[in-house]
Amino acid sequence: MEPLHAACTDAELIVTLANGQKVVTPLWWYPRLLHATPQQRAKYELSPFGVHWPDIDEDLSIEGMLVGSKAPGANQPEPS
């Protein structure tokens, strides 16, 4: 489950794995990423098992994303 690329939209985190699979999670699951600037989100480091954003000190494992682990303080936004 090695990540090859990570990207954020306004609503989702998308991580592409070495096997071609894409893991997509709601961005609100990770408040640090949700509130980060586009530049901070674009600056990430890959490891064999996850993604690290050094400017906001956020580390996410692929396994955690797959099982639906949300960061502490994650609150689903109200529908608009």
Question: What feature does the model see in each segment?
Answer:
Residues 1-80:
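Motif-centric detector for short Cys/His coordination patterns
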